[in-house]
């Protein structure tokens, strides 16, 4: 478990990756406490002066013009949490909820939200106790923030809802006892500050970002394996070609392939004078395709890194003037578009990988045995594995349709344009699984192709990558139950071990 002293608004992508992948012990920096207390004091000042301010002593949404009596303000906070906890579907994974909570703590602690330190410390205590609220994954349209998911996240503060602890689903009462906590009463504005924000969609999108980074690394390494297995040329990776175009992602991708393939190998030297003039695009244009994906990954990382440190509830409290201003930072359009870009990148990583599998099993293109198996006819080899890859790649094409272009008005047309960011981000998990499956099959196919090239050896790095999969899956000498092989290759990709083949600075969070 890592220990993080949180200076609000300064989370790095590498820190966020660590939080999303493992448990964290969280401590709020002392320097944040004054801003939190000052902000909460300004909310209390509004009440003391009898002023009417949206979100403090009014209704919400279409009911914003309804003033709430002072005696009903605590009931209002409880009511908004209970009424907005209307999500459906399976519960999010604990890791997602943990990241969502840390992002919410990070935002609230910047001192723009008018929330008391007691409430923030309650959330920190839950994170540190590893007792997480149960949050259904469906029910948010990404404006006015992720209302339903965040309401479910906040139910335990009131002693309501369910919680997850070490794989067990508990009542809020049981979960709070484990954490050594008791329910609290929310003060004016606190319910809205907790529920308003983009932390659910941002957490899901960040998970998608980190998975996309891992799969970019895997796609590069496995793509290099396929170049060697198919006796592809190194010429398309020449730095002069990519410098002439000037696309940064492409230039970096080509440099990575040169690193993975080296200047030459026994395999490459064996076909220097072959009659094939050009390779198919799935080999030759990898820097162009993967480089474009890398550009999208980097752009999404910039957007999501900013959002993770932003303040996205409403209204906001400005300490320098005492102003409390209503705006629209809860609208998750930046998150939705970033997630859409990641979806396109994931789809393309899988799409070009499937084409390389098809190339390897086709003897006319790869000059390898049909379907990568001896005694073809009796053995079908990789025939249906390629069909599986095609099915996964095709499914991703549907998933990649932009979610951010859709909008349905809500709250009696008060909230008349929404982002659909939560679905945009949530579908990235399914797309990750599909792309990972395609790459797992290509990993098996390229290793099989390299075995057929023996005794000729590939580049040092490619040989090392091949050895990783051969520790788990043996040479395919005849037909056998294929499912476990794909599962083993998939499990290897889940470990993200291929990230180690990339130099520093290629991927934003590594």
From Swiss-Prot:
The modification 2,3-didehydroalanine (Ser) is found at residue 144. Its EC number is 4.3.1.3. There is a cross-link at residues 143-145 (5-imidazolinone (Ala-Gly)). This is Histidine ammonia-lyase. Belongs to the PAL/histidase family. GO terms for cellular component: cytoplasm. It comes from the Bacteria. SUPFAM superfamilies: L-aspartase-like. The gene is hutH. Contains an active site 4-methylidene-imidazol-5-one (MIO), which is formed autocatalytically by cyclization and dehydration of residues Ala-Ser-Gly. It catalyses: L-histidine = trans-urocanate + NH4(+). The lineage of its organism: Bacteria, Pseudomonadati, Pseudomonadota, Gammaproteobacteria, Alteromonadales. CDD domains: PAL-HAL. Pathway: Amino-acid degradation; L-histidine degradation into L-glutamate; N-formimidoyl-L-glutamate from L-histidine: step 1/3. Pfam families: Lyase_aromatic (PF00221). PANTHER family: HISTIDINE AMMONIA-LYASE. It comes from Shewanella sediminis (strain HAW-EB3). Keywords: Cytoplasm, Histidine metabolism, Lyase. InterPro entries: Aromatic_Lyase (IPR001106), Fumarase/histidase_N (IPR024083), HutH (IPR005921), L-Aspartase-like (IPR008948), Phe/His_NH3-lyase_AS (IPR022313). GO terms for biological process: L-histidine catabolic process to glutamate and formamide; L-histidine catabolic process to glutamate and formate. It is found in: Cytoplasm. GO terms for molecular function: histidine ammonia-lyase activity.
């Amino acid at each position: 478990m890592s220990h993080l002293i949180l200076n609000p608004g300064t989370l790095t992508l590498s820190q966020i990756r660590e939080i999303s992948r493992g448990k964290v012990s969280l401590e709020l920096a002392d320097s944040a406490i004054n801003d939190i207390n000052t902000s909460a004091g300004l909310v209390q000042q509004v009440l003391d002066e009898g002023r009417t301010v949206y979100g403090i002593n009014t209704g919400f949404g279409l009911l914003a013009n309804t003033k709430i009596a002072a005696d009903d303000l605590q009931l209002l906070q409880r009511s908004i949490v209970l009424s907005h906890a209307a999500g459906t579907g399976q519960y999010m994974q604990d890791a997602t909820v943990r990241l969502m909570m840390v992002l919410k703590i990070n935002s609230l602690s910047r001192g723009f939200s008018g929330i008391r330190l007691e409430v923030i410390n309650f959330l920190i205590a839950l994170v540190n106790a590893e007792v997480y609220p149960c949050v259904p994954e469906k029910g948010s349209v990404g404006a006015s923030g992720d209302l339903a998911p965040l309401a479910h996240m906040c139910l335990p503060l009131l002693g309501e809802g369910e919680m997850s602890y070490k794989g067990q689903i508990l009542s809020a009462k049981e979960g709070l006892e484990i954490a050594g906590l008791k329910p609290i009463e929310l003060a004016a504005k606190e319910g809205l500050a907790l529920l308003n924000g983009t932390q659910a969609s941002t957490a899901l999108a960040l998970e998608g970002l980190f998975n996309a980074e891992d799969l970019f690394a895997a796609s590069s390494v496995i793509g290099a394996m396929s170049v060697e297995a198919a006796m592809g040329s190194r010429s398309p990776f020449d730095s002069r070609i990519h410098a002439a175009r000037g696309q940064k992602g492409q230039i970096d991708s080509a440099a990575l392939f040169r690193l993975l393939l080296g200047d030459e190998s026994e395999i490459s030297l064996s076909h220097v004078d072959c009659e094939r003039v050009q390779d198919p695009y799935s080999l030759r244009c990898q820097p162009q395709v993967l480089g474009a994906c890398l550009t999208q990954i980097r752009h999404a990382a910039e957007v999501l890194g900013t959002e993770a440190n932003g303040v996205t509830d409403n209204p906001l409290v400005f300490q320098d003037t005492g102003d409390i201003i209503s705006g629209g930072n809860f609208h998750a359009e930046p998150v939705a578009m970033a997630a859409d870009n990641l979806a396109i990148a994931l789809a393309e990583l899988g799409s070009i990988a499937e084409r390389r599998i098809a190339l390897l099993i086709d003897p006319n293109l790869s000059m390898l045995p049909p379907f990568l198996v001896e005694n073809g006819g009796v053995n079908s080899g990789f025939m249906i594995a390629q069909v599986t890859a095609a099915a996964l790649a095709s499914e991703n094409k549907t998933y990649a349709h932009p979610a951010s272009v859709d909008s349905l008005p809500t709250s009696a047309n008060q909230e008349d344009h929404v982002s659909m960011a939560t679905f945009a981000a949530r579908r990235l998990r399914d797309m990750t699984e599909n792309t990972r499956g395609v790459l797992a099959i290509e990993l098996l196919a390229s290793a099989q192709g390299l075995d057929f090239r023996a005794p000729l050896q590939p580049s040092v790095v490619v040989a090392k990558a091949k050895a990783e999969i051969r520790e788990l899956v043996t040479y395919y000498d005849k037909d056998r139950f294929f499912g476990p092989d794909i599962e083993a290759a998939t499990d290897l990709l889940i470990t993200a071990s291929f990230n180690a083949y990339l130099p520093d600075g290629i991927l934003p969070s590594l």
